[in-house]
């Protein structure tokens, strides 16, 4: 009986660390690069430009303590950049002296880890998607 309990415990541990879990289709999409449409604008320029880039999104395994009162909170991992590069779009119609170039990150690979406010928005889902205050301009002007 003890051997059976040991095997069951080993199987559950493997399932938890991903050995068995990742070999099958997960219930939720794991952290990975996905295409997303974003918007860029500048207060001094007359239009908003929408563009498609690759962002990190998806599920990261997390834990929650059952008895949280006496222990500090467990840091929750977020889906964030592992590798990225930067691309740019040019906002048309900007007056002289205003930089029309807006740079944005392009996710090359993603990972689950602590949120770095220097490169990620860790605020969670929004009630409304990020949108432009200015009229949108169809079409992309990549540099």
Curated annotation (Swiss-Prot):
It comes from the Eukaryota. SMART domains: GHB. It is found in: Secreted. Pfam families: Cys_knot. Its main location: secreted. Glycans are attached at residue 35. Disulfide bonds join 31-79, 45-94, 48-132, 56-110, 60-112, 115-122. Residues 1-22 form the signal peptide. GO terms for biological process: G protein-coupled receptor signaling pathway. GO terms for molecular function: hormone activity. GO terms for cellular component: cytoplasm; extracellular space. Keywords: Disulfide bond, Glycoprotein, Hormone, Secreted, Signal. InterPro entries: Cystine-knot_cytokine (IPR029034), Glyco_hormone_CN (IPR006208), Gonadotropin_bsu (IPR001545), Gonadotropin_bsu_CS (IPR018245). Promotes spermatogenesis and ovulation by stimulating the testes and ovaries to synthesize steroids. PANTHER family: GLYCOPROTEIN HORMONE BETA CHAIN, LUTROPIN SUBUNIT BETA. Belongs to the glycoprotein hormones subunit beta family. Heterodimer of a common alpha chain and a unique beta chain which confers biological specificity to thyrotropin, lutropin, follitropin and gonadotropin. This is Lutropin subunit beta.
